[in-house]
Amino acid sequence: MAAKGYEDAIISEHAASQMARRGISVALLKGVLRKPEQVMEVRPGRIILQSRARIGTHNQLVRVFVDVDVSPAQVVTVYRTSKIDKYWSEQ
């Protein structure tokens, strides 16, 4: 799936609360939405945008789940993980 910018996506209330709880800034989220390194379809209408980021002293993978079957697109949730190899697609 080709990378496309989703910077106009609305951040759901759930996603905003998860960002606050997980220490993910709006700037980091917007960066992934604007220019994701990878885009994967979970199911029709929902995609995952992900990018690697240096957070503190650690390399992390930021994963953003977006519903694209609504207009504008809506960020459902976002999290970061150190398990880059588990989720990174080499395709």
Question: How does the language model describe each region?
Answer:
Residues M1-Q91:
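Ribonuclease/tRNase effector modules and their secretory precursors
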